[in-house]
Amino acid sequence: MLRRARPTTFAIFLVAALATASVCLGAEPKAKKLKPVPLPLLPATQEWIATLDDAPSAGGAMDAERVYVPLQSERIVALRRADGSRVWTRDIESKWPPVVIGDAVYIVASDEMHALDAATGTERWRVPFEHQLTAPLAATTSLATGGTERSLVAVADKGLVIAVAAADGRTIWMRELGALSRFTPALDDVRTFVALDDGRMVALRLMDGRVEWDQKLEGKLNQPSVSRDRVFVGTNTNLLYAFDNSSGRLAWRWKAGGDVIGTSADAKGGAYYASLDNVLRAVNRGNGNQRWIKEIPTRPLLAPLTLGDGVKYEEIVVLTGATSEIDAFAAKNGASVGMYQPPPGGDLEGPPLIDGDLKPYQVAMVVITRDGRVIGLKPSAMLLPEPALLPLPPELPGRRLERERVTPPATR
């Protein structure tokens, strides 16, 4: 007697048969999506080293083609980024790092400001600048909201903040704040944020220099930074403050174990700050909740730098130490992902110059040493290793063949 199959059992067999048939008909399983790896900036391999005619007078600047370095012999030199060869030299003295905007290089001398063509070094404009800078120049990365031109922002003696038009050197506005600043201003598309020696954090509108907010904090302030809707500044009282960038409202603050020397942030809501207790911390940008904490191998010298887009590569945090060691950490969990130590005697002059858009076989990082060396570095992971040259064996494998002797035909 035949038994009737249950509908559930029949459905199971039908699904299995269809799945088998689809495989037989050539259907391919879905490929697994590869997870991005941390940006492979470090470790790095030295591509070239150039010896300057004199020691550098300040840190340098870099664009896609060249590296620009001011010298103590009152000159500025441009080197080719690919191989370190000299491109041009100009007789301009400066004790401040140059700034690059597009195809122009900007230098502040003792009493003038210069704009040079980046490719040739020829002068584009030159204007008197009677103020003494107290910190390196800052440059807008785009047109300010409501503005019509790119600008440079300088902090000078007497507590002056000055905005200069990048196109022609014209002074757009000046604002006196009543106290010196010793740190490069932080900029977004609307405002510039200045940390003052009297403990104030001030936001000025980029378009006209109007004061938008002013916050008084405890202790001496360090290098400010901005990311989306947050402005960060650390102090020598071991505190990190985060403010709303538009209103100046205190969003949160964190207590560290040492002076907080600087902060950077990524595109996914993370913020990273280093303190003089030899610790790097990651927190949520919005509310300050801690994500991870990492002891670092050397005392931090400069503010951290975050690189990576979070899509092609995961973000990394790059930190330069007092021993000139450069370390990279995964922004996701703080794991160490690489380091670079300059050659002996190679104390760094200024921060490393880094291009986060890595390309195979191309120099991505340049360091300048105080003894007058410039070193171009390629990420080791972006190089295909060449096969090692091996000596030929005395006997080749296989059976030796006897030479065939050909007897010429007899001639008549």
State the predicted function of each range.
Residues 53-75, 90-114, 127-162, 175-202, ...:
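Repeat-blade elements of multi-bladed beta-propeller folds
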Residues 1-13:
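Bacterial N-terminal signal peptides that target proteins for export
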Residues 80-83, 117-120, 165-168, 205-208, ...:
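Short loop/turn segments that connect beta-strands within beta-propeller blades
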Residues 378-389:
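Short loop/turn segments immediately following beta-strands, especially the blade-tip
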Residues 31-54:
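A short helix->beta-strand "capping" segment at the edge of beta-propeller domains
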Residues 24-29:
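Boundary at the C-terminal end of the N-terminal hydrophobic targeting segment
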Residues 45-50, 85-90, 122-127, 170-175, ...:
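A short beta-strand motif characteristic of beta-propeller blades
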Residues 11-22:
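Bacterial N-terminal signal peptides
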